[in-house]
Amino acid sequence: MLDSLKQKKNFQRIKMRIKTGDLVKVINGKDKGKTGEVLKTIPLENRVVVKGINLRTKHVKPTQEGETGRILTEEASLHASNVMFFSKDKNLTSKIEYFIDKQGVKKRRLKKTGEVID
């Protein structure tokens, strides 16, 4: 899969600072302003799946006789550049930076406030 992505004309892999379980706010697109938890990250495609955001409807036909068709609603992925980390405590969005603490452990913090995430 990585080889096929590299063959694309504009392939650019960016280090994702957003991780699964983070609370993010959508900053661009039809769901702009909504917040949700990251369910899944797709680093090779620079995309994230956020709970309750970018919902898509899928119509499923019956596969066996006697079974009824159904309509499924599921979250589609968003590009990572369209979401930003959201701090509940301060009620603001911020970029994330990495730093090494006094014990030599690499951690993340908010650039605006300096609040340590993990």
UniProtKB/Swiss-Prot annotation:
One GO cellular component term noted in the UniProt record for this chain: ribonucleoprotein complex
Pfam families from the UniProt entry: KOW, ribosomal_L24
One annotated GO biological process: translation
Keyword Ribonucleoprotein: yes
SMART domains: KOW (SM00739)
Domain of life (superkingdom): Bacteria
Keyword vocabulary terms for this entry: Ribonucleoprotein, Ribosomal protein, RNA-binding, rRNA-binding
Signal peptide coordinates: none
InterPro entries per UniProt: KOW, Rib_uL2_dom2, Ribosomal_uL24, Ribosomal_uL24_CS, Ribosomal_uL24_KOW, Translation_prot_SH3-like_sf
SUPFAM superfamilies associated with the record: Translation proteins SH3-like domain (SSF50104)
An example molecular function term from Gene Ontology annotations: structural constituent of ribosome
Alphabetical list of PROSITE patterns matching this protein: RIBOSOMAL_L24 (PS01108)
NCBIfam families attached to this UniProt entry: rplX_bact
Family: Belongs to the universal ribosomal protein uL24 family.
HAMAP family referenced in this protein's UniProt entry, alphabetically: Ribosomal_uL24_B (MF_01326_B)
Subunit structure: Part of the 50S ribosomal subunit.
Biological role: One of two assembly initiator proteins, it binds directly to the 5'-end of the 23S rRNA, where it nucleates assembly of the 50S subunit. One of the proteins that surrounds the polypeptide exit tunnel on the outside of the subunit.
Name listed for the protein in its UniProt record: Large ribosomal subunit protein uL24
Species in which this protein is naturally found: Prochlorococcus marinus (strain MIT 9312)
